[in-house]
């Protein structure tokens, strides 16, 4: 039976709203619900066995991401991809599992190529010694995780490295993209491209050299190292895709 209002205000209610929004978001991103197709609240409520309040909040979440729109007399309709907030971490996750997954991965790598070299240059010039040392520590943890062939450790260390890199730039606008970059890294690890390959040691070394350049205050070298790191990642993914790997 649908939950009552007290439950809707609780953690359980929020989880229900999240489940409905995520289920519909994945269907929209996969094309199961194409642009301009209607979404009927009553139908969704019956399908998920939730109240109108839960459905309404789930719809609000999707509308905030540009994926659906409610119009007077027209009802709620799926919006074209051009209307979606493609930088939203949830939208990135949902698209990653759909037909646009490969294209999105390449697009996000282009975004990283624009953001991370600039962040590296700023970070190297910042004089934020303590934060620079944190970046070097994250690079060291990345190396240990790769040596241990531990995907959870590797993922965590890589996320920490790139978060510190962008935060260390001191640029508030770049920092606004942290959620997007984190989602981009997640989509790379969940893309089907093998994580531990012959290129793993090279990638680990590139992270180390980038951290060293930043800690040394060499802005030119840091910018170049960051650009090389992202470009080599993109090349590896393309090569794996061409050879028959799944992205």
What role is predicted for each listed range?
Residues 1-115, 121, 243-245:
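Short linear motifs at protein or domain termini
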Residues 12, 139, 143, 148, ...:
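C-terminal all-alpha effector/ligand-binding and dimerization domain
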Residues 83-164, 202-225:
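All-alpha effector-binding/dimerization core of bacterial HTH-type transcriptional repressors
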Residues 36-37, 71, 154-155, 175-178, ...:
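Short, hydrophobic secondary-structure boundary micro-motifs
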Residues 60, 124, 166-170:
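Amphipathic alpha-helical interaction elements
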Residues 118, 122, 171, 184:
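Phosphate/oxyanion-binding loops and surfaces in catalytic or ligand/nucleic-acid-binding neighborhoods
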Residues 19, 56-57, 128, 153-154, ...:
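Juxtamembrane/interface motifs at transmembrane-helix termini
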């Amino acid at each position: 039976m649908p939950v009552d209002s007290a439950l809707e205000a609780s953690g359980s209610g929020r989880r229900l709203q999240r489940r409905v929004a995520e289920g519909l978001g994945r269907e929209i991103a996969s094309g199961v619900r194409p642009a301009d197709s209607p979404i009927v609240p009553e139908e969704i409520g019956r399908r998920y066995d939730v109240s109108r309040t839960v459905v309404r909040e789930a719809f609000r979440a999707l509308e905030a991401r540009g994926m659906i729109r409610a119009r007077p007399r027209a009802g709620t309709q799926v919006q074209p991809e051009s209307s979606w907030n493609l930088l939203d971490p949830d939208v990135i996750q949902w698209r990653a599992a759909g037909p646009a997954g490969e294209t999105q991965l390449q697009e996000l790598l282009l975004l990283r190529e624009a953001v991370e070299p600039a962040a590296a240059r700023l970070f190297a010039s910042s004089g934020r010694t303590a934060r620079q040392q944190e970046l070097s520590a994250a690079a060291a943890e990345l190396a240990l995780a790769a040596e241990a062939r531990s995907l959870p450790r590797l993922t965590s260390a890589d996320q920490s490295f790139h978060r510190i890199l962008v935060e260390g730039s001191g640029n508030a606008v770049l920092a606004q993209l942290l959620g997007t970059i984190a989602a981009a890294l997640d989509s790379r690890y969940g893309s089907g491209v093998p994580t531990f390959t012959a290129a793993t040691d090279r990638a680990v070394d590139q992270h180390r050299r980038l951290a060293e350049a930043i800690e040394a205050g060499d802005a030119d070298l840091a910018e170049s190292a960051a650009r090389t790191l992202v470009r080599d990642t993109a090349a590896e993914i393309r090569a794996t895709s061409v050879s028959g790997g799944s992205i």
